[in-house]
C-alpha cells in the first residue's frame, strides 16, 4: 500500500500549472476552428447561417461567465440559455463548441510537454511499421497459440462527469481551468438532462468531439496506469509454496509454525496471482486480457477489475461487461475480424525402418474471418444494398460525374479488401465486391436513364472491372507483394499490411 501511495504521489508531482491563461490567446481558437471545426478562416468564424463571428467574442464569454449577474441567471433560470444572449452573440451552442475545442487543445499541451521532456535514454524507439493497426495481429497470432483463457472487457465509462474532472487533478493543478470544465459539463447536464438521457450524451459527444476524446483518453490512461502498476507489483509479491498445506485460510499461521520447527526451510516462490504469460490489448472502448492460467485465475482478475473500478473511480460496473471464454472453444470480435484459436487435426505419417505409423495430432491455429453480416449491414445502412444484400442504386450520387461515381465505389471496394486482407476466407469479400460493382452499375444506369443490361452491353463488363482492379505495391511484413483485386479467383493467404493507421474509414468506410 505504501508503494502504491508513493507511486501515486510521484505522478501527482508531475502536475502542470498555468494552463488557464492560454485560454485567452487568440491563436488557440484559430487552431480550434481549423482543426476542430474544419473551417477555413482562423480568426473570423462563419456560422451555419453565414453570419460572421470573431474569436474575440469567445474570450469575452469566459470573462462573462464569472460575472455575478451571469451566475445568478444560471441558478435562477436553469432552462434558459446561460452562455450568451442571442441578440448579441447569435448562437451560444456554436460558441460553447468553439470554447470546448479550444479548452481541449490547451489541456493537451501539458501531456505533449511531458513526452518532449522524456530523457533520450528512456525514449521508446518509434518504428513506423508498428503504428499500423495490422501490426497487432501478427503479435496475437504468435502469442495466443500458447494461451488458454481470454477475458473480453467492455471498458465502463463514468456516467457522472465530475469523476473525469477529478481525474484531471492528478495531471493538471489549475483550479480555474477545472472550474471552466465543470461549467461546460453542468451546462449540458442541465440544458438537456445530460446525466439521464443517452440521446443527450450522444449529442454532447457529437458537438464536442475533441473534448470528449480527451476526457475519455485521460480516464483510460489513469486506469491503465494503476493497472500496470498493480500488475508489476503482483509479480514482485512471491507467496510461499503451499503444496504441503491444503487449508489456505490458516496458511500464514502454519507457515510461521513450520518455520520454527524447521529453521533451515527454504521458501519457494509461487506466482499465484500473476502469470508471466498474460497480455492486455485495448481497442475501441474494449479490452482483451488473455493468459495461460486457470479459469480460477481469470475469475480473480474479473473480481479485481470490478472492485478496482468501484473503489478507485467510485462507480459500479456490471460483471456481465467482462466475459471469460476459453480460446479453443470460442471466437471474439476484434477490430473488424472474428478471431479464434481452434484446434485443427493433423495427420502425420512416421516411417521407421520397414514400419510406418500414422500419428493423429492437433495443432492450434490463429484464425481470422470477416463478419459478413456486419459488413452487409454497413452497406445496407449506406444504401448500397438491401438488408438481405440485394444491390440497389445510390440516388444521391447521380448528380456526380461518371468518373467520381466510379472512383467512390472503387475506393470503398479497395479499402475493404485492403483492411480485411488478413481474412482466411475471401468469399465474403468477393460477395461485397459483387454488391458494390452491381450497385455502381445501377447508379450509372439511373443517371443516364437506362437499364443495367443496356448500360453493360454498351460499355462492356470490362469497363467496371477496370476501375475495381488495381495493382499496388505494398510493403507487407518483410516482403513486397503485388495485389490484384480480381473479381474471380480464390485467395486463401492472409496478409497483414503495415500502412494502416486509421480504422474508422477502413472498417466502416461508408460513413
UniProtKB/Swiss-Prot annotation:
InterPro entries named among the record's database cross-references: Domain_X, Maturase_MatK, Maturase_MatK_N
Transmembrane helix is among the record's keywords: no
Annotated Pfam families: Intron_maturas2, MatK_N
Subcellular localization(s) per the UniProt record: Plastid, Chloroplast
Molecular-function GO term, any one: RNA binding
Main location: plastid
The UniProt record lists the keyword Hydrolase: no
Top-level taxon of the source organism: Eukaryota
Single GO cellular component term: chloroplast
Keywords (A to Z) from UniProt: Chloroplast, mRNA processing, Plastid, RNA-binding, tRNA processing
A Gene Ontology biological process term: mRNA processing
Function summary: Usually encoded in the trnK tRNA gene intron. Probably assists in splicing its own and other chloroplast group II introns.
PANTHER family the record matches: MATURASE K (PTHR34811:SF1)
Family membership: Belongs to the intron maturase 2 family. MatK subfamily.
Protein name: Maturase K
Species name: Hordeum vulgare subsp. vulgare (Domesticated barley)
